[in-house]
A protein has these predicted regions:
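Non-ligating segments of multi-cofactor redox enzymes
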Residues: 1-220, 224-241
Length: 241
């Protein structure tokens, strides 16, 4: 039931993507920065970072519109991915984008205000035919990468939001703030590998949980490992550092 609910939430988020696209747009953040204002997308990215202090990357599994595409892409290509090379690419993209945002604010003389509806004055991102080009291009990039690379391939390779949440998660852990995590009773584990096979992020859950909890920023708290563990060795819980 939990996984069905999660997939329904992701589907709803995906269907709403024509409305919400600009709030996830890295371009809108740069456009706002060049005008000296924090746009809705930049404010959302910061909010995701703050939320990750307490909830890690749960957003990715339960609410991200592109997460919906990734979930359904597994039906075509469920191959585990090599996380480290893709992480280098993802953080490189994030670094370049962050540099443009910083440069934009610098050229504008700093942050002069906030504009949550920048480029979205009608409250709908895709509000005229020409904007469908951007919309379908974004969808195409995520679909192609997901199908070509494997499990959540686009998330691993190009997602510009996940670094914000990774920073929030690491900050929360470093500060010892109680965080939602996948916790375990290692004594119940029989090393059957079910959790590894089910993990959409290609994490080696069977080894990560042996210290009592999964403590990595790539865990998106989807609960696949929890719901498919035959020995009920895994569950959701709150842990500090």
């Amino acid at each position: 039931m939990r996984q069905k609910t999660r997939r329904i939430l992701l589907l709803v988020s995906l269907l709403l993507f024509p409305v919400t696209l600009n709030f996830f747009s890295p371009y809108v953040s740069i456009d706002g920065a060049m005008a000296g204002v924090a746009s809705g997308s930049l404010l959302l990215f910061v909010a995701l970072a703050v939320g990750a202090v307490f909830f890690g990357r749960a957003w990715c599994a339960w609410a991200c519109p592109m997460g919906g595409l990734a979930e359904y892409g597994r039906a075509v290509n469920d191959r585990p991915v090599k996380r480290k090379p893709l992480a280098v690419l993802r953080y490189s993209i994030f670094g370049v984008w962050g540099a443009f945002v910083a440069l934009g604010f610098l050229m504008a003389g700093g942050v002069k205000g906030f504009d949550p509806l920048r480029l979205t004055e009608n409250l709908v991102s895709v509000d005229e035919p020409v904007k469908y080009i951007t919309y379908y291009l974004v969808l195409a990039v995520f679909v192609v990468l997901t199908l070509a690379v494997g499990r959540r391939g686009a998330c691993h390779a190009i997602c510009w939001m996940s670094p914000f949440m990774a920073v929030g998660y690491v900050a929360g852990r470093w500060l010892g703030i109680p965080q939602l995590r996948i916790v375990s009773e290692p004594g119940k584990c029989t090393d059957c590998g079910s959790c590894d096979r089910r993990c959409p992020m290609s994490l080696p859950v069977s080894s990560l949980h042996k210290r009592g909890a999964v403590r990595v920023s790539d865990c998106i708290l989807c609960g696949e490992c929890v719901d498919h563990c035959p020995k009920k060795a895994l569950r959701y819980g709150v842990r500090g550092r």
